[in-house]
């Protein structure tokens, strides 16, 4: 085994930045191939197909979000073991994580395919896009095992600070997805089915690459197929830490489903404009989540090493990074809003709605940056329940109440869109208040 290199030493901003950059690039590549997917569908299949893909995203996030959120528990446990230089703990946590990934992936495939028509009906999906949405989602969920296994495997590498390796495999998947889209949608004329198949195959490719690396590795996180099993004491800890984040993701996704249902009530043209914006929004939120993940890993490893002061300094630095990136992204997207929405479709009305929606989001991205990065640090210390409460109150409870009031008393697209920046403001203030009180800095240095 090689010497364990951790984030518990060195210049803080460099450790966080150099860890976050591959994550940011990876997420941008992931968003790139998702965006290209939508561009190809919108231009070669039609605006209804674009609306179908867009409305499907809320359901995908609902189910995948729980699995990815629950993997936070594994990441926190592994990072704390790694920071404490506990090689045996890392080994057992890695194999428990893989067992969870395989079980969750199979379960997600079955549930996803089964609930697709029901969920789309509950969302009020218009008849003209309903059938395409069902087909796209069911084909997508047929390959969801690969997505879950890849993301959990990448989570292992991220927990030990090796974000560069997962970037390489994500780039391979992104390039594969773009070529497969061109072949299946443009060349073979498979339409929306081809787009979903391209995503499934590209996720399988990334899954094969990352598992191959873990199996061949000589590091403490080496994967051995025969050792994949759940260690009961670790399973309970992963669940205790990870389930709150999983619940957080699934409930927030439910609130987004309610927002999507409200958007659906304005018709397919508005749906297409909203779908185009959501793809663009990923270029802000995914890098912010990458910085948040860097903050989680940094906090987890330094909590494991018992370095509280370093955790606090890392929180300030990573929060500044997240807010700064969001400010720049918001300004750029506002300036070029018509051009970026116009990439997805030639329908002028769809472009008009997409630009209109962007004006409600982009000026307030900085609040979302602060909220997520502070939340990432809190989760890294093991306080996932507290972070969950803040996110549920603001991004779910408040958002649902806002939509209920809007649809009852002042039904307009602008009022619906305002639920996002107002909920970000509430969440940011609540998270700052929790951090300011300081109770999260009671070190969790007990053996895990």
Across the structure, where does each feature detected by a protein language model lie?
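Residue-level signal for short hydrophobic patches within transmembrane helices
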Residues: 9, 13-32, 36, 59-66, ...
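Transmembrane helical elements of multi-pass membrane transporters/channels
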Residues: 18-37, 139, 150, 173, ...
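Small-residue hotspots at the loop-to-helix junctions and early N-terminal turns
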Residues: 45-58, 133-137, 196, 268-283, ...
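Small-residue-rich hydrophobic transmembrane alpha-helices
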Residues: 50-110, 147-166, 260, 273-337, ...
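Hydrophobic transmembrane alpha-helices of multi-pass small-molecule transporters
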Residues: 62-65, 177-182, 207-211, 283-286, ...
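Short runs within selected transmembrane alpha-helices of multi-pass transporters and secretion channels
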Residues: 71, 140-158, 166-174, 195-208, ...
């Amino acid at each position: 085994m090689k010497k364990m290199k951790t984030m518990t030493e060195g210049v803080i901003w460099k450790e966080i930045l150099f860890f976050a950059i591959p994550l940011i690039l990876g997420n941008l590549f992931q968003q790139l191939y998702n965006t290209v997917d939508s561009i190809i569908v919108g231009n070669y299949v039609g605006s209804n197909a674009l609306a179908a893909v867009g409305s499907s995203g809320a359901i995908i996030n609902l189910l995948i979000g729980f699995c990815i959120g629950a993997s936070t528990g594994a990441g926190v446990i592994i990072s704390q073991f790694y920071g404490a230089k506990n090689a045996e703990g890392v080994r057992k946590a890695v194999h428990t994580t893989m067992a969870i990934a395989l079980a969750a992936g199979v379960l997600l495939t079955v549930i996803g395919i089964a609930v697709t028509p029901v969920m789309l009906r509950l969302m009020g999906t218009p008849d003209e896009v309903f059938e395409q949405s069902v087909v796209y989602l069911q084909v997508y969920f047929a390959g969801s095992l690969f997505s879950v296994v890849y993301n959990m495997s990448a989570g292992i590498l991220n927990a030990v600070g090796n974000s560069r390796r997962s970037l390489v495999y994500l780039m391979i998947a992104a390039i594969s997805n773009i070529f497969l889209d061109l072949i299946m949608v443009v060349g073979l004329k498979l339409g929306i089915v081809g787009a979903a198949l391209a995503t499934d195959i590209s996720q399988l490719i990334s899954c094969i690459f990352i598992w191959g690396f873990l199996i061949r590795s000589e590091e403490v996180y080496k994967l051995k197929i025969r050792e994949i099993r759940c260690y009961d004491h670790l399973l309970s800890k992963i669940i205790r830490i990870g389930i709150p984040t999983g619940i957080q993701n699934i409930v927030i996704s439910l609130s987004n489903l309610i927002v999507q249902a409200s958007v659906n009530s304005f018709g397919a043209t508005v749906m297409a404009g909203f779908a185009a914006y959501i793809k663009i929004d990923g270029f802000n939120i995914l890098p912010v989540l990458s910085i948040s993940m860097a903050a989680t890993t940094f906090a987890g490893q330094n909590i494991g090493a018992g370095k509280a002061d370093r955790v606090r300094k890392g929180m300030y630095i990573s929060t500044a990074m997240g807010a700064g990136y969001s400010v720049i992204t918001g300004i750029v997207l506002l300036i070029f809003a018509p051009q970026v929405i116009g990439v997805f479709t030639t329908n002028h009305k769809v472009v008009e709605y997409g630009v209109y929606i962007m004006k409600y989001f982009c000026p307030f991205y900085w609040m979302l940056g602060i909220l997520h990065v502070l939340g990432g640090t809190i989760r890294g210390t093991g306080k996932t329940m507290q972070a969950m409460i803040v996110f549920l109150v603001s991004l779910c409870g408040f958002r649902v109440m806002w939509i209920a009031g809007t649809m009852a008393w002042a039904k307009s697209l602008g009022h619906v869109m305002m639920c996002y920046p107002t909920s970000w403001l509430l969440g940011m203030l609540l998270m700052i208040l929790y951090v300011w009180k300081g109770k999260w800095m009671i070190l969790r240095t007990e053996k895990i």
